[in-house]
Amino acid sequence: MLFFVKICIFQSFFVLLHGFYGLRAGTHSIDMKELIEKAKHIVIFTHMAPDGDAMGSSLALWHYVREFKSSRVQEFKEVTVIVPNAFPAFLSWMPGAEQIKIYEKESAACNPLIEQADLFLCTDFNDPKRIGPMGEKMLANPVPKILIDHHLMDERIRGLVDEGLWVEVHSHPEACSSCEIVFKLLRDEWISGLEDERLPNEIATCIYTGLMTDTGNFSYNSTNYELYEIIAFLLRAGVQKDEIYNAVFNQYSTDRQRLTGYALYRKMRIFPEYHLALITLSADELDQFHYQPGDCEGLVNMPLQIADVFYSVTMREERAKPGTPKSRIRLSFRSQGDRPVNVWASEVFHGGGHMNASGGEVLGSLAYAVKLFENSYMKYIKK
């Protein structure tokens, strides 16, 4: 009797979640589980400079496909996660991270995988340009492509969707992360593809990591109570949240900490009238602190801890690579409350994102990027 009651509670919980998180299907009535059943060579893509959500959502899908079983399909499936460039060292502990291929370092090995793939799973981006040179190669292969993402679509991307680039689209800007969407898919749509109805610990760990990192440890974009019901389920599945937090946030190098101190002490400008902070870091300055990918992660949030600072922007210079004449400036935008930064990021800095968290980039010098900033902030910021 007790077992029956537990099953009823379990089923009721996911009926509620299904109501909370209705997904937007693509224009074709194709079952994703069926696509996975038929596919033999699957490639999973995520965006440049992979963060916790990119890593978590792609690795959760990777583990799922590896464990996929059905009554019709039992043979081995080749599945590979390919990222455009290196991911931060503080995410290298994630289950399966050692199997990820980095296109920037392994393009010769990656290109045949992309060309031979019969299914692409694309997570945490909606613009093929966000995966660098792999984007064109993905577009050249006419096999089914599934999109899972929580970023806003501009008109150009909506046009690609309308043209049928993706055979299935799960786009939910209201979700806190792509991992939230992946969780919903795995639990409600694809669960029958697993050997049993457990959510394996590897998948649960990857999903929790994405939820945690994309909300700043649940400090922003995390007010929906349904999110905490998902977290509760993941904890019941065996996720060790304290260990994950320690692995992500308490493993910084000495150089990273010194870079953070330098950025806040020497490089932060405050615009009091506009409640705005700006931090700029040149490539030479980053070299002084032996910069590694991810060392500036979270830096943009720190000025928001200052009283009366509601907007924060960071700029980080990447040197021009061989064959490219200009440096690339990476920008991060953060804000608090009803103060959007995504329009500013989109219209001025070729980026976009969420209302309170966006990104952008500029091809050119750091001085040029700062000039764009100085000529535009008064238009986009509420005083």
Segments predicted by a language model, with ranges:
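Hydrophobic helix-and-loop "lid/oligomerization" segment in the mid-to-C-terminal part
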Residues: G22-M48, G56-P95, Q99-I102, A108-L119, ...
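Active-site cofactor/cluster-binding pocket
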Residues: K101-V167
